Amino acid sequence: MKPKILLLLATLCCSFPIWGQKENFSYKFYGFVRADLFYNTRATMAPVDGNFYLYPLDKLPDAEGKDINAGPNGSFYTFTTRLGLDIKGPHVGTAMTSAKVETDFGGFSKNVALLRIRQAYVALDWEKHQLLIGQTWHPLFGAVFPDILNLSTGAPFQPFNRSPQLRYQYQTKEITLTASAIWQMQYTSSGPDGMSEDYMKNSCVPEFYVGADWQHDNEWIAGAGAHLISLSPRKQSEWEGNIYKVNERMTTTSYEAHIKYTGTNFTVAAKTLLASALDHTALLGGYGIHSVDPQNGKQEYTAFRQSTSWINFTYGQKWKPALFIGYTKNLGTGQSLADTETLYGMGLDIDQLLITNLNLSYNLPHWQFGFEGSVGTAWYGDVNARNGRVENTHQVTNFRILGLMMYYF
C-alpha cells in the first residue's frame, strides 16, 4: 500500500510543473528590497508614514505661542519593497499580448504594511497601435519624471498617480499619440466627505487625457498634453432643516509640457503644468464653493489653479550626483469664493512652494546606495475670497535627510 501512495505522490509532484506552464506564455519576475532612513527638522505633509515627503506643514502655535510643528521627526522603513511579474502571451489575431501585475506595501491607507496593487493590466500591441486595459501610471506622470531618491519621485511638482484606465496609443518611429480615460481607486479627489472615489463615481464621467510625444535617437523626448476632470461633490444638500436632492458638478482642465535630453553620461529633464484640481495626483490643488442656491442649498464650485514646474540634472552612472528643483505658485481661482473656510484639496493656503534636492548615489549591478538632502520652503497665508489667491504670507522651512539602500532582482 505504501509503495502505491509514494508512487501517486511522485506522479502528482511531477505533474505540477506541467500544470504551471502555459503554451506560448513567458513569465519574468522582478522587484527590489528597499530601505529608507529619513530625518526632518519639522512636521511635514508626508503620507505613507512619512516616506512620501511633499512639503513642510504650517506653524501650529500652542497656548503660549510655541510652534508645535517645529519639532523634528524621523524613522526607518522597508515596506516599499516591490514585487512584479511581466507576462507575454500568444497573439490575438495580429496583436501581441502582454500583462503586468505589480505590488508593494507602500499604500496611502492607515496601515501601510498591507499588500496593495500598484499595476495590473493587459495590453494588445499591434505594429503602430496599442490598447491598454487596467491599472498603470496616470498619463500625467508620463515618460519624463525626475531621477531622485525620495519615494515621492518629484511630487508635489511631478504628478504621481496610478489608476484604472483605458489607454490607446498610436506610435510611429518618432511620434506617440495618447488618449486615455481614467477612473479613480487608490489616488482620489477631495470633497465634502474627504478623499473619496465617490465624487467621480457619482459623476459618471472619467478623467480624460490626450497628449503627444516626440522621441529622437534615444536622446530627446518632448511632448505636451491636456487633462479634464469632472466631479460630482454632492448628491444631496441639507438646507434650512430640509434635505434636497441636488445635481452638482465641478469640471476643470489642466495642461502640461515636458522635455528630456539624455547625453552620454548625463541627463537634463523638465516639466511644467498649469494644474487645476490635481490633488489626487499628489500636486497642490483643489476647489472651493463659488455660490449657494438660496432655494435648496445647491452649490456651484470653482477650481484653484497652480503653476508648477521642475527641472532635474543627473551626471554619471556608477557614482551619480543629481540636482532637483521644484516650484509651485498658487494662481487663485477662476471665480470668487463664497467661503474660504470650506475648501477641498491639498495645500490651498500655500502661495508658493520651493524645494531644492541634492543627492548622490552609488550604483552597482543589483545594488544602489544613496544619500539625499532636501530644503523645502512653503509660503503660507490667508486665502482671499475675491480671487482665491494667498496673501499675508509667512514662510516655514524643512530640512530633510534621506539614506537609501536598494537591492534589485
Each model region followed by its residue ranges:
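Outer-membrane beta-barrel translocator domains and adjoining extracellular loop/strand segments
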Residues: 43-48, 110-117, 143-151, 188-198, ...
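Outer membrane beta-barrel
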Residues: 22-49, 59-61, 65-187, 204-205, ...
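Membrane-spanning beta-strands of outer-membrane beta-barrel proteins
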Residues: 78, 115, 161, 205-207, ...
